[in-house]
Amino acid sequence: MGDKINFIFGIHNHQPLGNFGWVFEEAYEKCYWPFLETLEEYPNMKVAIHTSGPLIEWLQDNRPEYIDLLRSLVKRGQVEIVVAGFYEPVLASIPKEDRIEQIRLMKEWAKSIGFDARGVWLTERVWQPELVKTLKESGIDYVIVDDYHFMSAGLSKEELYWPYYTEDGGEVIAVFPIDEKLRYLIPFRPVDKVLEYLHSLIDGDESKVAVFHDDGEKFGIWPGTYEWVYEKGWLREFFDRISSDEKINLMLYTEYLEKYKPRGLVYLPIASYFEMSEWSLPAKQARLFVEFVNELKVKGIFEKYRVFVRGGIWKNFFYKYPESNYMHKRMLMVSKLVRNNPEARKYLLRAQCNDAYWHGLFGGVYLPHLRRAIWNNLIKANSYVSLGKVIRDIDYDGFEEVLIENDNFYAVFKPSYGGSLVEFSSKNRLVNYVDVLARRWEHYHGYVESQFDGVASIHELEKKIPDEIRKEVAYDKYRRFMLQDHVVPLGTTLEDFMFSRQQEIGEFPRVPYSYELLDGGIRLKREHLGIEVEKTVKLVNDGFEVEYIVNNKTGNPVLFAVELNVAVQSIMESPGVLRGKEIVVDDKYAVGKFALKFEDEMEVWKYPVKTLSQSESGWDLIQQGVSYIVPIRLEDKIRFKLKFEEASG
């Protein structure tokens, strides 16, 4: 036996909650189904498969033949089911009670197709030591992470061809390291190269094991892989040669643990894969991180010292993207509220799907349809519990928010940030109208002369960013909310707002307002630099009404502007100036139909809020919402009303 190498081959198949149906369909046709069909033809090939809950639900509803074939392969011993949180949460980011329930749901599904699952695929391989207790309590014996985790703990690469034990609070679990070299070989290099590498590991130790476990989408969905993997026959050759090679002993995780013991005890730090430590850093620091890595590579010492190069951790995304943080903290709030409500918890668990909370190579938090799916389920879960009025630091930034509820809406105000309306969620439509992501500089945009100088002057990557995209790029001074108050000089234009060039007098969008609660509403006030703003907001059955009283004591005329950022995402808007007593917008596939209403005829400026982000297909200029601005000349004192109405039809 010492003249062989044990080899565990695993895949992880996942589609985000809320992804488009055509994406599921294409992934199924190009990847999931042909992979499983090919596997069926090679009865000696063994594969550990993890399938995420959103994908399982789609398969059950649309392609039950996949589940049937998977069940058959499990029965004949070819497939081991590896579980995770059912709706693919980052386990470290959700409460312990929710982790246990998420894992229980997936273990029950695995049992329904004939497998008693004992192992966990760790979503995005985000590890923190206290997960050990949760996993053991969930009946899990082993977990799979990257070899980078082990090297970060001080182990050498040569020590990473065995699983180890790790412990926390007296609970012990086995941990398998994924071989990074195999991740880059499979399926991108010829099969000969894979076999050559596996053969090179043989040294007479019969317990030695090489582990490959990576995204199943690499086998057909990633650019160029369908032709390579299926049409040119890579997968068939791989299955054929791996399963017939006398020097390779194919195993499943459970088979390995039945035959061999883990090698010893290790303590892994909080970690994910190496690239995540770059992506999770704030943009300026991520830029420095990339420069540092490149400098080490130029000097030829990166590989030698790589394990000591560490950036951020996954939870840094909640610092990097405040919109993600708010969504996450609302999820934690709802989790506590519905802990004993099984019906509500179904929706809560869906709202924990990880993809919409972060951003790396793929769109993630930048994709409005993924965030909409989170809010849809959060609002459903929240609606099982009546809140009334809540004063609480919802987002954990040290300042109180005020949540007001009526039969149809949740409204959350942030007095510390310009008295803005930071959430306006409809119980009927299951949308948050204020789900608008701010425009931010990302480290892969290249260098920008000034982060807030309006139109971006991008140098390093300007040849890669098409001109028609680059001319629309701007970065925001403030977060994107409703009822944001601006005091700016006369002569300020729509274009100034659109490209963040407006010169704010007094920083009203982010200064703190005082507040008092009213019956069904709130009054917010601020006096600053001789400008006094009072806004009284009341929730009504079909939206909210606000009355503004603004007093200019300076003697100098200015422009007072109220901004409402609305998550209009399915109709592509253009900048423009509107006038009237009513502005009606019908966003059929996102937030639906709504109206802005005024007592008198008003001018309204509008422009689309477009972010620039990277994805697997290149550059994405995505409309996150539309900014509606009501500009009014302020000489001494003005009083006006506006209404946001959820319109029918």
Swiss-Prot record:
The active site is at E124 (nucleophile), D215 (proton donor). PANTHER family: ALPHA-AMYLASE-RELATED, ALPHA-AMYLASE-RELATED-RELATED. Belongs to the glycosyl hydrolase 57 family. Displays a broad range of substrate specificity, with the capacity to hydrolyze carbohydrates as simple as maltotriose. Pfam families: AmyA-A_glucT_m, AmyA-gluTrfs_C, Glyco_hydro_57. This is Alpha-amylase. Optimum pH is 6.5-7.5. GO terms for biological process: carbohydrate metabolic process. Its EC number is 3.2.1.1. The lineage of its organism: Archaea, Methanobacteriati, Methanobacteriota, Thermococci, Thermococcales. It comes from the Archaea. GO terms for molecular function: alpha-amylase activity; carbohydrate binding. Homodimer. The keyword Hydrolase applies. InterPro entries: A-amylase/a-glucTrfase_C, A-amylase/a-glucTrfase_central, Gal_mutarotase_sf_dom, GH-type_carb-bd, GH57_Enzymes, Glyco_hydro/deAcase_b/a-brl, Glyco_hydro_57/38_cen_sf, Glyco_hydro_57_N. It catalyses: Endohydrolysis of (1->4)-alpha-D-glucosidic linkages in polysaccharides containing three or more (1->4)-alpha-linked D-glucose units. Optimum temperature is 100 degrees Celsius. Inactive below 40 degrees Celsius. Extremely thermostable. Keywords: Carbohydrate metabolism, Glycosidase, Hydrolase.
